[in-house]
Amino acid sequence: RVVLAMAASLAAGAATAADLEQVYRDALAYDAALASARASLEAGREKLPQGRAGLLPSLNLTGNSSWNDVNLKHYDVTRGYNNNGWQVQLTQPLFRWQNWVQYKQGEMQVALSEAQYQLARQDLTLRAAQGYFDVLVAQDVLAAATALHEANTQQLALGKKSFEVGTVTITDVHEAQSRADLSSAQMIAAESDLAVKRHALLVLTGKEPDALKGLRKGVALSRPEPADIQSWVASAETGSYAVQAAQIGREISDREVERNRSAHLPTVDLVASYGNAVGSTAAVSLSPIRTDTD
């Protein structure tokens, strides 16, 4: 939240604010961890209607149809007959404690998914700000290392000319050479570090970062209010998304124990049914088989 407030204040007046805000927006759209948390949030929200389904009435429709052929040996069958029937049954749960507990678990699952998603967004905000300022620091370090190397290179060139006219010793030239070599190595290390920090920002945002502008000079950050660490600790204990997620997870586990125990409780349902059955009779003409004998 502090980083978000800082980003908002920068967006209000500093030229770099757009850069920081853009990095954050790019990370929101690209970061895989946040995308996974967003998918988990959508899946968690489905737990509520799934749990509610156990409290709602259910309608069951059944039907049957059959045809029967009359087949009697030694007789002629004129036709068969059929039976048709259907039934509608409505069931409304009145007392199913297991379903009620499952519904409450669904509510908690939604709250847990929300807390985990907000925690992922908060983590992304910190990582985006960290990556942004890491690049700024690396740029400044490289600029300082480059300036130092240029100064040492000029001193080395001046020392060599002075040695030619005899105003300095060869030891002075060697020391100048050592300083130039050291500053060259520091500049190469700074270039490598900047490349690493820029790549980290690329992994976070999915975009190759351009040269980022530095902060305005003279930016004054206000002190946190209240300026009491204990107040912030107490606020974190109640408002932290990580703490909220842990508490909700514990409540879900407690409810799961209750749900398993309630499987042994009696259930009461209101059941209403209506049906109809129709059929035709078999009109069968039976004729004895005539046998002639000599």
Language-model features: where?
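Bacterial Sec-pathway N-terminal export signals of envelope proteins
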Residues: 15-64, 70, 92, 208-209, ...
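Transmembrane beta-barrel architecture of outer-membrane proteins
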Residues: 22, 83-85, 130, 175, ...
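Periplasmic alpha-helical coiled-coil/stalk elements that build and connect Gram-negative outer-membrane
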Residues: 121-237
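A glycine-/polar-enriched beta->alpha junction
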Residues: 25-35, 42-57, 87-105, 115-122, ...
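Bacterial N-terminal signal peptides that target proteins for export
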Residues: 1-4
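Residue-level detector of the transmembrane beta-barrel scaffold of outer-membrane proteins
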Residues: 58-62, 87-89, 109, 245, ...
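Small/polar, glycine/serine/threonine/aspartate-rich low-complexity segments that form flexible
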Residues: 62-94, 215-226, 258, 271-294
